Swiss-Prot record:
Changing S125A: No effect on protein stability. GO terms for molecular function: DNA-binding transcription factor activity, RNA polymerase II-specific; RNA binding; RNA polymerase II transcription regulatory region sequence-specific DNA binding; sequence-specific double-stranded DNA binding; zinc ion binding. The modification Phosphotyrosine is found at Y27, Y128, Y135, Y142, Y289. Belongs to the krueppel C2H2-type zinc-finger protein family. It is found in: Nucleus; Chromosome. Residues 34-53 have a biased composition (Acidic residues). The gene is ZNF768. Binds to mammalian-wide interspersed repeat (MIRs) sequences in euchromatin and promoter regions of genes at the consensus sequence 5'-GCTGTGTG-[N20]-CCTCTCTG-3', consisting of two anchor regions connected by a linker region; the linker region probably does not contribute to the binding specificity. Required for cell homeostasis. May be involved in transcriptional regulation. Its main location: nucleus. This is Zinc finger protein 768. Changing S90A: No effect on protein stability. It comes from Homo sapiens. One of its GO terms (biological process) is regulation of transcription by RNA polymerase II. Gene3D superfamilies: Classic Zinc Finger. PANTHER family: ZINC FINGER AND SCAN DOMAIN-CONTAINING, ZINC FINGER PROTEIN 397.
């Protein structure tokens, strides 16, 4: 009888037919001695032997079976080495540890609570679980298939050196966490950040298995000035302008607090480094923010944003009372004070109150006689920048404000408003003494001086009196021969700006004064008045 060819690495006594391996009876015979098999064969021949039916998936247990300890790794009886030179693994698998020795068949049958493992599998790290929680033990027939059984354990057994190195590091880290006093020279508590050790003693809530204390409360007062809290609030050790806005570096609410950022030119101090940088642009004249439309430059980005709204016409700030819109929030705040009547800015000299700080500043210059804005052409000084701009239009001849009815233009907006009243024959300003009405408040003020004795201005050269100081100044130029207003086209000089304006119309051909009766136009208002008298004489 020829011996059947066996798979590589298996001994003859380990080979059984596939039918026997897949049935419970065949599995029992594989675990019996020769005498027991002969007795069973005789009983089968005589028909006296009855095979007890075994539920599928369970293995028979011998009477002397004892459950193994958790450390014991149960092995399959099909692949136990019979000789020292036995090799039952495919190429590429890691050799088994010499600590594993052949076991008796009694250890093959395990309780359902123990899971069957491969003899080549070893846990790589403490607590490693190769199976999912829902794993169920396989049936005996399934476990007897060596090829499928070995393929399940190949990935678990063939681990790379990097995985073993990571496992050793993980084990060392776990030991350090479990024994912080022995492993860590810093004596850091488990689960606590190193910076949290500075807050010990201030009521922090510990983590881990330590007893839970009261909830954390931020300390105040002198505790905030301790080095521990100083390090927590400024871990990089920044000071001054480098720190920027912060709780300790910035300005406190209410205008109080440290101001470590000092200007080296004027000595003014600031709570924030960015505010100091903006302030220094006043001394240097730097204007890094430039408008792309008109090329106007600004020292602050916020001023550029406000300026750009003049080009776009955007007015995002709207009054909830009257619906009037503004391009800047400060303008809206100033406008809302007109509804409430609030005037928080009071002059310390005369007690007069104003709704805006700029109005108060402008008023205070009347007490100090300060005139910081000077004209580069004639050297005349003004207390307001707007007054200087209006004056400069006299030299340039610019008239940006024009009347929508007759087309007459003016260098100042304040001059256009009373002119518009002349078309409506409106004269809202009335003299309380004589009842005479005027279209401008300034003209009424000049007229009122005629009723007050001693309120006139007299010329020291000829004794002529005037109701306005500006008229006296113009008169004095007739004695001195001064002609500060000069034409840019022909170079002719004049003592009054109004006379220069009339002269400009000779070069431009402008005739802004038009007769309503015949439509004839004139360059001067006096010529129009003289012409209108001809129509009035004809009506008579």
């Amino acid at each position: 009888m020829e011996r059947e060819a066996l798979p590589w690495g298996l001994e003859p006594q380990d080979v059984q037919s596939s039918d026997e391996m897949r049935s419970p009876e065949g599995y029992l015979r594989g675990n019996m001695s020769e005498n027991e098999e002969e007795e069973i064969s005789q009983q089968e021949g005589s028909g006296d032997y009855e095979v007890e039916e075994i539920p599928f998936g369970l293995e028979p247990q011998s009477p002397g079976f004892e459950p193994q300890s958790p450390e014991f790794e149960p092995q399959s009886p099909r692949f136990e080495p019979e000789s020292p030179g036995f090799e039952s693994r495919s190429p590429g698998l890691v050799p088994p540890s010499p600590e594993f020795a052949p076991r008796s068949p009694e250890s093959d049958s395990q309780s359902p609570e123990f899971e069957s493992q491969s003899p080549r599998y070893e846990p790589q790290s403490p607590g490693y679980e190769p199976r999912s929680p829902g794993y169920e033990p396989r049936s005996p027939g399934y476990e007897s298939e060596s090829s499928r059984y070995e393929s399940q354990n190949t990935e678990l057994k063939t681990q790379s050196p990097e995985f073993e190195a990571q496992s050793s590091k993980f084990q060392e880290g776990a030991e350090m966490l479990l024994n912080p006093e022995e492993k860590s020279p810093l004596n850091i508590s488990v689960g606590v950040h190193p910076l949290d050790s500075f807050t010990q003693g201030f009521g922090e809530q510990p983590t881990g298995d330590l007893p839970i204390g009261p909830p954390f409360e931020m300390p105040t007062g002198a505790l905030l000035s301790t080095p521990q809290f100083e390090m927590l609030q400024n871990p990089l050790g920044l000071t001054g302008a480098l720190r920027g806005p912060g709780r300790r570096g910035g300005r406190a609410r209410g205008g109080q607090g440290p101001r470590p950022n000092i200007c080296g030119i004027c000595g003014k101090s600031f709570g924030r480094g960015s505010t100091l940088i903006q302030h220094q642009r006043i001394h240097t004249g730097e204007k890094p923010y430039k408008c792309e439309v008109c090329s106007k430059a600004f020292s602050q980005s916020s001023d550029l944003i406000k300026h750009q709204r003049t080009h776009t016409g955007e007015r995002p700030y709207k009054c909830p009372r009257c619906g009037k819109a503004f391009a800047d929030s400060s303008y809206l705040l100033r406008h809302q004070r007109t509804h409430s009547g609030q005037k928080p800015y009071k002059c310390p000299h005369c007690g007069k109150a104003f709704g805006d700080s700029s109005y108060l500043l402008r008023h205070q210059r009347t007490h100090s006689h300060e005139r910081p804005y000077s004209c580069t052409e004639c050297g005349k000084c003004y207390s307001q920048n707007s007054s200087l701009r209006s004056h400069q239009r006299v030299h340039t001849g610019q008239r940006p404000f024009s009347c929508g009815i007759c087309g007459k233009s003016f260098s100042q907006r304040s001059a256009l408003i009373p002119h518009a009243r002349s078309h409506a024959r409106e004269k809202p300003f009335k003299c309380p003494e004589c009842g005479k009405r005027f279209g401008q408040s300034s003209v009424l003020a000049i007229h009122a001086r005629t009723h007050l004795p001693g309120r006139t201005y007299s010329c020291p050269d000829c004794g002529k009196t005037f109701n306005r100081s500006s008229t006296l100044i113009q008169h004095q130029r007739s004695h001195t021969g001064e002609r500060p207003y000069r034409c840019a086209v022909c170079g002719k000089g004049f003592c009054r700006s109004s006379t220069l304006l009339q002269h400009h119309r000779v070069h431009s051909g402008e005739r802004p004064y038009k007769c309503d009766d015949c439509g004839k136009a004139f360059s001067q208002s006096s010529d129009l008045i003289r012409h209108q008298r001809t129509h009035a004489a004809g009506r008579r």
